[in-house]
């Protein structure tokens, strides 16, 4: 059985095309598996707190201080996130590398009462949550909302 020159060229081009697809596919797969692996294996389980109406990201400072005073071993880190009306976020504090249960407080520039404000804050919180999850790769969390902060979840 002989293969014509035309068939040989077509088979060669198909093979080259498949090899050309395989290389970027392999690279893409490795990158995504690495991201998923990092997310899946995360030991970080933050406590995300949202203060109620008229309260700021400083609302839980006393609570965190008291928790750390009574805690043996690694103390809770405190990261405060302020979400501005334009969706911008500013961070203060940090998460210690050895702390698997840091406290993250999310406060809002628009911290006023009212149903329409709570709906806006809920949308802004979703953006903040996604940014935090992307940055810190946690796959679970504990949530605490004080007063209207509980409605934002």
Regions found by a protein language model. Name each.
Residues 53-139:
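Active-site catalytic motif of lipid deacylating hydrolases and related acyltransferases
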Residues 18-37:
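Membrane-interface motif at the C-terminal end of an N-terminal transmembrane signal
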Residues 44-45, 101:
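Alpha/beta-hydrolase fold active-site loops
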Residues 144-149, 153:
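Gly/Ala-rich beta-loop-alpha elbow adjacent to hydrolase catalytic centers
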Residues 45-52:
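Short beta-strand element of the alpha/beta-hydrolase
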Residues 46, 140-142:
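Structural motif
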Residues 1-17:
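N-terminal Sec-pathway targeting helices
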Residues 40-41:
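Composition-driven low-complexity repeats that form or flank extended alpha-helical/coiled-coil segments
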């Amino acid at each position: 059985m002989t293969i014509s020159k035309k068939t040989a060229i077509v088979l060669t081009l198909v093979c080259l095309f498949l090899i050309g697809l395989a290389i970027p596919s392999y690279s893409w797969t490795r990158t995504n598996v690495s991201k998923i692996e990092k997310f899946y294996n995360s030991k970080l389980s933050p406590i995300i707190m949202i203060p109620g109406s008229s309260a700021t990201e400083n609302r839980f400072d006393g609570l965190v201080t008291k928790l750390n005073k009574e805690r043996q071993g690694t103390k809770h880190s405190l990261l405060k996130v302020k979400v501005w009306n334009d969706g911008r976020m500013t961070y203060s504090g940090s998460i210690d590398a050895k702390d698997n249960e840091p406290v993250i407080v999310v406060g809002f520039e628009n911290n006023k009462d009212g149903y329409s404000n709570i709906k806006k804050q809920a949308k802004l919180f979703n953006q903040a949550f996604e940014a935090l999850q992307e940055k810190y790769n946690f796959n679970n969390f504990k949530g605490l909302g004080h007063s209207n902060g509980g409605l934002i979840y």
